[in-house]
Amino acid sequence: MIRTKISAENLNLFYGDFHALKDINISMGERQVTALIGPSGCGKSTFLRCLNRMNDIIPTCRVQGKLMFEDSEIYHPDTDVVALRKRVGMVFQAPNPFPKSVYENVAYAPKLHGLKDKARLDEIVETSLRQAALWDEVKDRLHKPALGLSGGQQQRLCIARALAIQPEVLLMDEPTSALDPISTLKIEELIRELKQYYTIVIVTHNMQQAARISDKTAFFLVGDLVEFDDTEVIFTNPKDQRTEDYITGRFG
């Protein structure tokens, strides 16, 4: 029995008068990869940003309904957003390393949370870089600028940076869209490895990628969650005609 990690019940989100998410109901399992697919503007990235309240930075944004992280309500007035984001990490579309050394990029968040012990920081940096399949490539250049890494290495560094505070959930917003095919393959292999330890939610425009790496797939269209099922079902026997039309390239 797979334990539910994140669930939404009649979740609605508005940007001013614009209804961006409409009555979303979904349950995402622990240590599974859930892919969010759909055409541009369908609400998939908006939904992803709800999961660690990144939408809070938009003044006109308001949320109705229930969004749960295990037994805690994500949008409850008493929710500690900093603590939430420690448990729910995020990797963005374009690699965005800080203009610091490789080491300082990974050590940044643990230091921010008050960790000062050098030996412990060293351990976290190495462990995180190993988990991100980057350690062997950067172990001899830890104190050199992160911006000197290739695009694929920078994105894996950003994953290591997110892992450094030991989150339970990792959100990925099109993490390979700016990368070449070889770097994309490495990130996909990494995602398959990481799901042993983390719950992963990924937004992707790449149908083949969703089919390759995810356990569950959610198809969004103009703010509606049209269909959510095992990835194999979504791609081979979808229940909704709109899902089939999108997957087969009839629109999108």
From Swiss-Prot:
Q: Name one GO biological process term.
A: phosphate ion transmembrane transport
Annotated ATP binding lies at 38-45
Sorted UniProt keywords = ATP-binding, Cell membrane, Membrane, Nucleotide-binding, Phosphate transport, Translocase, Transport
Highest taxon listed in the record's lineage? Bacteria
| Biological function | Part of the ABC transporter complex PstSACB involved in phosphate import. Responsible for energy coupling to the transport system.
Q: Which family does it belong to?
A: Belongs to the ABC transporter superfamily. Phosphate importer (TC 3.A.1.7) family.
Q: In its UniProt entry, what is this protein called?
A: Phosphate import ATP-binding protein PstB
